[in-house]
């Protein structure tokens, strides 16, 4: 079971990684004149998203629901977050690769192709949804019902079996 002190530490780490993601999304365009710094920020951002994915799955694995073999129940409850996180991760990597390819050799030019603008908008939209759903999932996983046998779990199990 995830103890309160450990949960607070894990939640703080998740929020720190989300804050870094928000920071890079907000201010990375200001550093387009320094492509090496922008590249490092993008790499760290992608690693932070990957760490958040790992942390959320470790939290899933730590639940009584998962240990009882009800993986389908967890997936059903949190599939939106799982899918959105994967989509956001793919969009972020795509945007970072595209931006670095266009601006690496000539960082003085302000290059925005139609495709890049479209990808930029979708990545930023996905970022907002990712932050909301990820925070909601992280907080919901603090519910004690996920860490012990309960009437709620038995009722959910019966609904899944139908």
Curated annotation (Swiss-Prot):
A Pfam family this chain is assigned to: TMEM138
Protein's cellular compartments: Vacuole membrane; Cell projection, Cilium
Keyword Transmembrane helix annotated: yes
Ranges that cross the membrane: 7-27, 41-61, 80-100, 115-134
InterPro entries: TM_138 (IPR024133)
Record keyword Secreted present: no
GO cellular component: cilium; vacuolar membrane
Keyword vocabulary terms for this entry: Cell projection, Cilium, Cilium biogenesis/degradation, Glycoprotein, Membrane, Transmembrane, Transmembrane helix, Vacuole
Glycosylation sites: 6
Top-level taxon: Eukaryota
Membrane-protein topology: Multi-pass membrane protein
Example GO BP: cilium assembly
PANTHER family in alphabetical order: TRANSMEMBRANE PROTEIN 138
Functional note: Required for ciliogenesis.
Family, similarity comment: Belongs to the TMEM138 family.
Name this protein carries in UniProt: Transmembrane protein 138
Origin species: Bos taurus (Bovine)
């Amino acid at each position: 079971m995830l103890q309160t002190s450990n949960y607070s530490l894990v939640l703080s780490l998740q929020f720190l990684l989300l804050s870094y993601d928000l920071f890079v999304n907000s201010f990375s365009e200001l550093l387009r004149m320094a492509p090496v710094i922008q590249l490092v920020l993008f790499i760290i951002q992608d690693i932070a998203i990957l760490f958040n994915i790992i942390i959320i799955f470790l939290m899933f694995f730590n639940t009584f629901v998962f240990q009882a073999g009800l993986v389908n129940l967890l997936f059903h409850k949190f599939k939106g977050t799982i899918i959105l996180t994967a989509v956001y991760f793919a969009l972020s990597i795509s945007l970072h690769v595209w931006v670095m390819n266009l601006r690496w050799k000539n960082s003085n030019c302000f290059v925005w192709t139609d495709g890049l603008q479209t990808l930029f908008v979708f990545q930023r939209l996905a970022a907002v949804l990712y932050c909301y759903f990820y925070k909601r999932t992280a907080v919901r996983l603090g519910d004690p019902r996920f860490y012990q046998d309960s009437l709620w779990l038995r009722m959910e199990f019966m609904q899944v079996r139908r």
